[in-house]
A protein has these predicted regions:
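ABC ATPase nucleotide-binding domain signature region
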Residues: 1-35
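Short coil-to-helix "N-cap" segments within the ABC nucleotide-binding domain's helical subdomain
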Residues: 33-51
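Conserved ABC nucleotide-binding domain
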Residues: 51-70, 85
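GG-anchored amphipathic helix commonly corresponding to the ABC/SMC/Rad50 NBD signature/C-loop
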Residues: 71-91
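Walker B catalytic motif
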Residues: 91-96, 101
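Helical segment within the ABC ATPase nucleotide-binding domain
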Residues: 103-116
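H-loop/switch region of ABC-family ATPase nucleotide-binding domains
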Residues: 123-125
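A short, surface-exposed alpha-helical micro-motif characterized by mixed small hydrophobic
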Residues: 130-132
């Protein structure tokens, strides 16, 4: 995957998540085509599940995303990009409409993506206010502004 696009609210209709599918099925739908045809599907699903268990309880992964809370779904959408590992992740207004308690989670996940080697672009207004609230030094160090 060359480019990933994280929209403002990934769980809205037409977003990047499939509500009626389980979280595990959402991940498999995204990752199995990337794995290629040489790997057995059952082995891929097992690998995806074992990696996802580091982030989410198994019970949650086997439930439809429609049963998850909004913060959980938001975290899952960023986690999906973490696994897909595109070269560039473009995030459109990731903090807009979010409770301030979600800002830290989003920032931490974006830093994890950057540590994995992704270039992360944040297209947003009000980023100064976000920077004032965060204590994530790596996020602040990696942040570069383009103002026009």
């Amino acid at each position: 995957t060359e480019i990933g696009i994280q929209i403002e609210q990934p769980d809205r209709p037409g977003g990047v998540l499939f509500d009626n599918m389980t979280a595990l099925d959402n991940l498999c739908t995204s990752l199995i085509p990337k794995a290629g045809q040489h790997i057995i599907r059952k082995k891929i699903v097992s690998s995806i599940l074992s990696e996802a268990l580091r982030w989410f309880p198994k019970e949650m992964l086997l439930q439809p995303l429609s049963s998850w809370s909004y913060p959980e779904r938001l975290r899952f959408s960023y986690y999906r990009w973490y696994l897909l590992n595109p070269r560039l992740l473009i995030c459109f207004f990731p903090f807009a409409g979010q409770e301030s308690t979600h800002h830290k989670m989003i920032i931490d996940l974006l830093v994890l993506c950057a540590q994995r080697g992704m270039a992360v672009w944040i297209i947003s207004s009000g980023i100064d206010a976000i920077c004032e609230k965060t204590d994530n030094e790596e996020f602040l160090r990696r942040l570069h502004y383009l103002n026009k």
